[in-house]
Amino acid sequence: MATYEETAHKIIKDAIKSAIFIDENAKEPYSDDKPQETDRSIALYNQFKDNGISLSVYKYSNTNYLTHKDYIFANRDLVLLDWKLEGEDHGGEKSLELLDEIVNRQRHIHFCVIYTSEKEDYVLKNILSYFSGSTKAEYEDFKIDLADKEEEIKEIMPILNELSLKRFTDWKVLYNEIRRSKRELLSYILENIVCDSSLCSLIKCGMAFDNDTIKSNIQEPCPSSIDCVLHTLCIENTIIIILNKEDVNPDILFQKFGETISTYRWGVMQLAGLEMQNIQKKNCSFIDENILRVTRKALGYHRNEDFDNFEDFLRNVMLEQQALNLRDEKLTLVEAIDREPYDEKLQEEYTSMNVFYNSVCLKKNKPISFGDVFRCDGEYYICITALCDCARPGKRNNSFYFAKGTSITCNDALKIGDGGFISYLNNNEYVKWNLKSSSDEPVYIVPESLLVPCNLIVDQKIEVEKLVFENGVSKIKTYVFEYVTTIKQNYTQRIANHAFTHPVRVGIDFVKKK
């Protein structure tokens, strides 16, 4: 049986099939000129081809970049990016702008290599200062606020720089060294740079007074992993490797990516996603012989049958086709993961797993649908209206069914497990949907019918009307529901099934012991 590391290496190799090499001195195919990186361009092209990877070569020009952006990034798995673009003396700024594009907008690209003739540590420091959660203007403000202590801060700059690199590993030793020798300075820094943690405040202090690194003009996400030995890091869902120019070849890349994701604490689910993506590319299709027997005219007739949301219907059919195709495929990653006993220290990770299994937050404006969860006045509501009725609200006069829930603790949610009717909305919110006062009483989920005049969720909010009784008088009251997340279909269906048995319950009487 393959080890976890061997499995990771194979998954990554299968995941990278389309790459692009970006350098201002690259030699593009069919070009007569012979720029500085001609030999490297040809060598890389052949090396990647021998490994079953299609490599495109792009000669970077700031003038043409926006015109060619779709060509550069569309359907790429890997980007090889020169650290110095457009003849920059010290390099970095243009490359970091492209890295921003990859990390924040080209989210299908999971792998990036920055190759350089500079020292790898220097490039890593610049990436960390650019992707740090603070802007160039904010760092200038930090320097002004801490100006009185600038000389003292400069004395501990080596420790602050090391803290940044080792923030996920050996930071406590370095932090305690500052606390022991510079307690007053530490308090002063923490007062002026307010962050989620003392460690973060110190890292930002070091970056503010490092005049040799590049800062971003906008807020960028922070890394979730840094390896200062391998010179690798993870930002969002992108793994970034910094390599010397002479070391750029597919074998070294696969080895480095494999080592990085194998040692990355959160890498296992990234590998699971990559393997599913590999299986989907290789073996699964939205099209089979039955669908190829359908003409545009026949499909048009089905659409014409009073089908307001035919697009949703067709998309769901295609997704179910894909799910059935994937159902029997083997995940090699599972065999490489050892079985483990319950560990109280991992409660936060167990919770994150349940959030992933249970829900997905959809940020865009959309019509209300089956499984959508809302928050209002400290209570929670989940839409349990059938999908077909959600798609055509007019057929039910815009009346929607909801179940109402209350907040519970993370510990209680984990104790209940799949034996109750609970939902993991995110890492901070957990909801119980059933009404039950004691263990001897039956579990009830009571459906509520609410009027939704406009079924579109806009800016995460939707208005709902409810019939209420105040002082014996009935009236319609309007509430603003705030969208939280969407519970996945099978979990919502379980809640809905139980809720709709409530109206058909039958009351009986027995003599019972008190």
Sequence positions of predicted segments:
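Charged, compositionally biased non-catalytic regions
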Residues: 281-350
